[in-house]
């Protein structure tokens, strides 16, 4: 059976000796241990895509890549990023992905100016619909988090898209046991090292919903071990004043998703039929001031985001549109992406990031203290909780960078036509497959499983922030 799937995957790949004959490379979108992501334009059609270039290496097996391809090939949903095509050369695999340029979920909230429960409900409804589709096809995402939820376009009514299927898994007999995911979003049964099922995705959606309604996570602690214990206990609470303006229906919805017992936890189907999603109980009261402030304080960008983000693609597409309508403009140009500010506020997320500096805490609005109050729904909840781009010189692509696709006949291009770095394929000596998102989010060169994030800590009767340790479970 495994051999048949492998042969099927091989037959689906298109062979190429020079990928640049098919695509014009326009921007660097991201880079990781084994892959680089570019904004490209297909020469034949003029369409824009995100091209994920994955090095072949003797130090790394293709099984994880084949798994990601198998998952992406199998799914077709309006709220899930699409794998358009696959190419293969002697040195690389190339995944041609649907380009998602609308920016990230938190950024869109901060830009709105007005934000309500109903807005959050519409987002979660799309996520539930997509995850329900995955589950019906025997696929568990296993790494749902706000950073993997991006808007398709910059338009106000844009759809939400689920991205990054590097940790996704096709269920066998409905049960899995390999620990993986992101701290803060991982279900209790995963941390308890028990066999688990698709219910882990529903728990993650519950955490995301909680954050969307208050701006901080339901589980936070000073250390990794304490954080994991809190999650395994399944305790959280809806603190005042942060939850005073939130409906009882929203709280009930969250309680059903953050159910410690996976057998009692809402499925996507049940969640979609809840009045907060399918009815009219989601309030239209503006909660933007409180939520936006907490998001900025607890999920700021520079802790996780790479220099190239969704704004870079939007900027490039607009510039490209103007250039193509100007006389005497060459089709293949070297564009200047927007420069990022080193002082930009930052948000914790990926365990691949190390935070060196903590932002100054605004004591005027502190995070809720770690108090223990009984949940009104019958559950006993708890308290909520840079890489510099050497390829950039003055905001433009540096010609000597290994991330820059070389023109034919210029300098030392690799045999694939993608980049010169493929000449040193096995130099990193890594043995794990790092699945970087095909979209515009953080993807470090080094695969670390520790990070420092800002967590609220109870001390001297008040909440304050301190650098704490969180971790992520190993990739399958």
UniProtKB/Swiss-Prot annotation:
Q: What topology does the record note for this protein and the membrane?
A: Peripheral membrane protein
- Residues annotated as catalytic: 143
Q: Where in the cell is it found?
A: Cytoplasm; Golgi apparatus membrane; Cell membrane
Q: Does the keyword GTP-binding apply?
A: no
Protein's UniProt keywords contain GTP-binding: no
What Gene Ontology molecular-function terms does this entry list? ATP binding; calcium/calmodulin-dependent protein kinase activity; calmodulin binding; protein serine kinase activity
Q: Where is the composition biased (Polar residues)?
A: 338-352
The Gene Ontology biological process annotation of the record reads: signal transduction
The entry's stated outcome for residue 443 to T is: In a breast infiltrating ductal carcinoma sample; somatic mutation
| Keyword annotations of the record | Allosteric enzyme, ATP-binding, Calmodulin-binding, Cell membrane, Cytoplasm, Golgi apparatus, Kinase, Lipoprotein, Membrane, Nucleotide-binding, Prenylation, Serine/threonine-protein kinase, Transferase
UniProt cross-references to Gene3D superfamilies, sorted A to Z:
Phosphorylase Kinase, domain 1, Transferase(Phosphotransferase) domain 1
Domain of life, per UniProt, equals: Eukaryota
Q: In which tissues is it expressed?
A: Mainly expressed in brain with small amounts in skeletal muscles, kidney, spleen and liver. Strongly expressed in forebrain neocortex, striatum and limbic system.
Q: How is its activity regulated?
A: Activated by Ca(2+)/calmodulin. Binding of calmodulin is thought to result in a conformational change and leads to activation through phosphorylation by CAMKK1.
- Catalytic reaction annotation: L-seryl-[protein] + ATP = O-phospho-L-seryl-[protein] + ADP + H(+); L-threonyl-[protein] + ATP = O-phospho-L-threonyl-[protein] + ADP + H(+)
Q: Where is this region: Disordered?
A: 325-352
Ranges where the record places region Calmodulin-binding = 297-318
SUPFAM superfamilies in the record: Protein kinase-like (PK-like)
Choose one Gene Ontology CC annotation of this protein and give it. cytoplasm
Modification after translation is described as: May be prenylated on Cys-473.
The similarity annotation says:
Belongs to the protein kinase superfamily. CAMK Ser/Thr protein kinase family. CaMK subfamily.
Q: What is known of its domains?
A: The autoinhibitory domain overlaps with the calmodulin binding region and interacts in the inactive folded state with the catalytic domain as a pseudosubstrate.
**Function field:** Calcium/calmodulin-dependent protein kinase belonging to a proposed calcium-triggered signaling cascade. In vitro phosphorylates transcription factor CREB1.
User: What is the protein's name according to its record?
Assistant: Calcium/calmodulin-dependent protein kinase type 1G
Source organism (scientific name)? Homo sapiens
């Amino acid at each position: 059976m495994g051999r048949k799937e492998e042969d099927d995957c091989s037959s689906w790949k298109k062979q190429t000796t020079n990928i640049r004959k098919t695509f014009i490379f326009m921007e660097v979108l991201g880079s990781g241990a084994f892959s680089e992501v570019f904004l490209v334009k297909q020469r034949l059609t003029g369409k824009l895509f995100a091209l994920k270039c994955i090095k072949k290496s003797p130090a790394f097996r293709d099984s994880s890549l084949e798994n990601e391809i198998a998952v992406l090939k199998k799914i077709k949903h309006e709220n899930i990023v699409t794998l358009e095509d696959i190419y293969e050369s002697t040195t690389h695999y190339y995944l041609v992905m649907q380009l998602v340029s609308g920016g990230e979920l938190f950024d869109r909230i901060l830009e709105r100016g007005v934000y309500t429960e109903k807005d959050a409900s519409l987002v979660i409804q799309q996520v539930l619909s997509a995850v329900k589709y995955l589950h019906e096809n025997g696929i568990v995402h296993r790494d749902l988090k706000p950073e993997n939820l991006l808007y398709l376009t910059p338009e106000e009514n844009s759809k939400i898209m689920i991205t990054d299927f590097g940790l996704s898994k096709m269920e066998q007999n409905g049960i899995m046991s390999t620990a993986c995911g992101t701290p803060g979003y991982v279900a209790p049964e995963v941390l308890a090292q028990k066999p688990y099922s698709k219910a882990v995705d529903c728990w993650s959606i519950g955490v995301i919903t909680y954050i969307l309604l208050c701006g901080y996570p339901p589980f936070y602690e000073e250390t990794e071990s304490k954080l994991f214990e809190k999650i395994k206990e399944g305790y959280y609470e809806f603190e005042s004043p942060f939850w005073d303006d939130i409906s009882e229906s929203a709280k009930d919805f969250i309680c059903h998703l953050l159910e410690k017992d996976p057998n009692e936890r809402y499925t996507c189907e049940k969640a979609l039929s809840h009045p907060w999603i399918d009815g009219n109980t989601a309030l239209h009261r503006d909660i933007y001031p409180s939520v936006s402030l907490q998001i900025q304080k607890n999920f700021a960008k520079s802790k996780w985001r790479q220099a190239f983000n969704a704004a870079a693609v939007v900027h490039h597409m607009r510039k490209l549109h103007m250039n193509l309508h100007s006389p005497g403009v060459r089709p293949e140009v070297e564009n200047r992406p927007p420069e990022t500010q080193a002082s930009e506020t930052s948000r914790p997320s990926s365990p691949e990031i190390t935070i060196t500096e903590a932002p100054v805490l605004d004591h005027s609005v502190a995070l809720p203290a770690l108090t223990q109050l009984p949940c009104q729904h019958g559950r006993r909840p708890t308290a909520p909780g840079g890489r510099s781009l050497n390829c950039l010189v003055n905001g433009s692509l540096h010609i000597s960078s290994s991330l820059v696709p070389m023109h034919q006949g210029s300098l030392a291009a690799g045999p694939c036509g993608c980049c010169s770095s493929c000449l040193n394929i096995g130099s990193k000596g890594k043995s794990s497959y790092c699945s970087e998102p095909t979209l515009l989010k953080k993807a470090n060169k080094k695969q670390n499983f520790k990070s420092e994030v800002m967590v609220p800590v109870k001390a001297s009767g008040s909440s304050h922030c301190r650098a704490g340790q969180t971790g992520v479970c190993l990739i399958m």
